[in-house]
């Protein structure tokens, strides 16, 4: 997929207006699907959103960024707080927030339980059960599930 051609196509189909600036992938984006730069008019998109969430979600993110783009160059309110932006975003069925990306490097949690009071503890890191005790009753901790690494 050629990103620039795709954004131009979405702009014409959904907004009826041409997109004439630069578009690029930006791997450094973490918690956002895309960015609009008013200074020079270019757009950045997160490639992980396209790869992991699919074309349908990515198209809605492109619409979101194009809302910023077209409203800015029309001299209307282009920020998230502006009524013009909210109305246009709703009209073109764009996403307000990017869905959470599946995190491939998240470790499964280890689950511990106190043998006396049955209090449960979830931890990312291993607890030395010979050294540490329950914070409520000082009972011994027992590892319930050991996830496969």
Swiss-Prot record:
Q: Which InterPro entries match?
A: SprT-like_domain, SprT_Zn_ribbon, Uncharacterised_SprT-like
Q: Which GO terms describe its cellular component?
A: cytoplasm
Identify the keywords attached in UniProt to this record, alphabetized: Cytoplasm, Metal-binding, Zinc
Q: Quote the record's binding site residues for Zn(2+).
A: 64, 68
GO annotation (BP), single: response to stress
Q: Which residues form the SprT-like domain?
A: 4-143
Q: Where are the transmembrane segments?
A: none
Query: Which locations, inside or outside the cell, does it occupy?
Result: Cytoplasm
Predominant location category: cytoplasm
**What residues make up the catalytic site?**
65
List the signal peptide residues.
none
Cofactor(s) the protein requires to work: Zn(2+)
The GO terms describing molecular function are:
zinc ion binding
Q: How is the cofactor bound?
A: Binds 1 zinc ion.
Task: Supply the NCBIfam families for this chain.
Answer: PRK04351.1
Family to which the UniProt record says this protein belongs: Belongs to the SprT family.
**Name of this chain's protein:** Protein SprT-like
Organism of derivation? Streptococcus pneumoniae (strain Taiwan19F-14)
Higher taxonomy: Bacteria, Bacillati, Bacillota, Bacilli, Lactobacillales
């Amino acid at each position: 997929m050629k990103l620039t051609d795709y954004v131009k196509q979405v702009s014409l189909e959904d907004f009826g207006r041409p997109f004439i600036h630069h578009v690029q992938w930006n791997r450094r984006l973490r918690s956002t699907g895309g960015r609009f730069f008013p200074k020079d008019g270019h757009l950045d998109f997160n490639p992980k959103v396209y790869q992991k969430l699919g074309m349908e979600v990515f198209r809605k993110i492109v619409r979101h960024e194009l809302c910023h783009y077209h409203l800015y160059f029309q001299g209307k309110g282009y920020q998230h707080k502006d009524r013009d932006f909210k109305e246009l975003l709703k009209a073109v069925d764009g996403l307000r927030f990017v869905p959470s990306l599946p995190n491939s490097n998240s470790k499964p949690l280890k689950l511990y339980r106190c043998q006396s009071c049955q209090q449960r503890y979830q931890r990312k890191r291993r607890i030395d059960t010979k050294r540490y005790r329950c914070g409520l009753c000082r009972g011994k901790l027992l590892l319930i599930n050991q996830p496969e690494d």
